[in-house]
Design a protein with these regions (language model features):
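Phosphate-ester processing/binding pockets and catalytic centers
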Residues: 1-141
Length: 141
């Protein structure tokens, strides 16, 4: 069985906590979120994405950020996603969040160590239980 895993992040891997966030300072949290599903179920995720893009009259090539969604769009996304998850138990949403203030010094020295550790905690079991995995992380900014 082939498993598709899509990964995205919210926050950044910077460590400037002396300045306010987005005014020279880094995010205080880092979240990784993934959706894991059998290959044949990826079409259902694509339908949700297309529905949001169509509602906003936005081309698929332009990434849509949740911060750009209004309340009605967020409600539509949640409604469609909740319905999908209730009908397809083999589709999983997962997330992990770290409060960066409490990250140990070793992980602060090399941001990839923290990022990779979070991926391991989030996805290792799913990856090990799958014969084949297509791992599709979003490009990190």
């Amino acid at each position: 069985m082939r498993t598709f895993i899509y990964l995205d992040e919210s926050g950044d891997l910077g460590w400037n906590m002396d300045e306010p966030y987005q005014k020279g300072g880094s995010s205080r949290m880092l979240t990784l979120a993934a959706i894991c599903m059998p290959e044949e179920k990826s079409k259902y995720i694509q339908r949700i994405v297309r529905a949001l893009y169509a509602k906003r009259k936005r081309p698929l090539k332009n990434e849509l950020k949740s911060v750009d969604l209004n309340l009605k769009d967020k409600e539509l996304f949640l409604t469609l996603t909740t319905k999908l998850l209730s009908e397809h138990k083999d589709i999983q949403l997962r997330s992990i969040t770290v409060h960066k203030e409490y990250v140990n010094a070793r992980m602060k020295k090399d941001p990839n160590v923290l990022y990779n550790y979070m991926i391991k905690c989030l996805l290792l079991k799913t990856i090990c239980n799958s014969q084949y995995v297509d791992f599709m992380p979003d490009r990190r900014s």
